[in-house]
């Protein structure tokens, strides 16, 4: 109430992947927001397996305009390793239900999970393109200190970033984890190529044009035309 009434805040980001875990809890919050009729623009996070079709109408009426989903991988085998138990049909069905309710979806995808191969990463890109979410984040699997992947990387003696910038997804020094089948450079190259394939897709750009307008399409086309400079990929090119 204070943010809206005293400061005129309209846009809010709820950084909690468990926000919709307890349906009774989230519906209670939505009811209070609906009563206030603040006309908010809310971005919230959710696990795919916690989104229930019965809550979508309330979420939309409460002002939630975006749900960011951790889809992670297009390979069921790799998803199982990441403890994501839904199959592809479940994922497609949930995303379509959210979009049908008038809520935009930001899909989060990871390339380079421990069991990933070039084929499974391609499956991830294929799923992302099939879903055609209003936005997509493409990440490389990273051994962030304190995470389970970091513990695994140390135990296996895998190379880790030598400086903090190496943990930054978009930095020149970015060094993701290698997989059981691919080098870190191969993972990073696939991720960067996948980003440009997705955001340059005519089907995606046409959807953006219809949904957000020509100005947003131009902005995304400009973004997709730029390539990130990567130390690992320069080393890969030199080796070839």
State each model region's role.
Residues 4-15:
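Active-site groove signature of glycoside hydrolases
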Residues 18-23, 27-216, 239:
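A structural motif corresponding to the C-terminal lobe/cap of the Radical SAM core domain
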């Amino acid at each position: 109430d204070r943010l809206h009434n005293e400061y005129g805040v309209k846009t809010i980001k709820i950084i909690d992947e468990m926000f919709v875990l307890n349906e009774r809890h989230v519906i209670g919050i939505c009811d209070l927001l609906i009563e206030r009729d603040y006309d908010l623009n809310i971005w919230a996070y959710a696990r795919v397996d916690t989104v229930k079709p019965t809550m979508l109408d309330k979420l939309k009426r409460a002002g939630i305009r975006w749900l960011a989903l951790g889809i992670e991988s297009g390979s069921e085998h790799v998803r199982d390793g990441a403890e994501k138990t839904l199959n592809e049909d479940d994922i497609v069905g949930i995303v379509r239900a959210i979009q049908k309710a008038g809520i935009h979806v930001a899909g989060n995808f990871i390339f380079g999970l421990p069991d990933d191969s070039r084929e499974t990463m391609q499956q991830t890109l294929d799923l992302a393109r099939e879903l055609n979410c209003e936005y997509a984040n493409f990440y490389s699997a990273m051994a962030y200190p304190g995470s389970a992947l970091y513990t695994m990387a140390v135990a296996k003696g895998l190379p880790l970033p030598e400086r903090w910038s190496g943990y930054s997804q978009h930095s020149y020094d970015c060094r993701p984890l290698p997989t059981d089948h691919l080098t870190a450079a191969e993972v990073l190259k696939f991720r960067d190529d996948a980003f440009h394939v997705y955001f340059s897709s005519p089907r995606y750009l046409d959807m953006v044009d219809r949904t957000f307008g020509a100005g947003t399409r131009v902005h995304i086309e400009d973004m997709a035309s730029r390539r990130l400079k990567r130390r690992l990929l320069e080393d890969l090119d030199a080796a070839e």
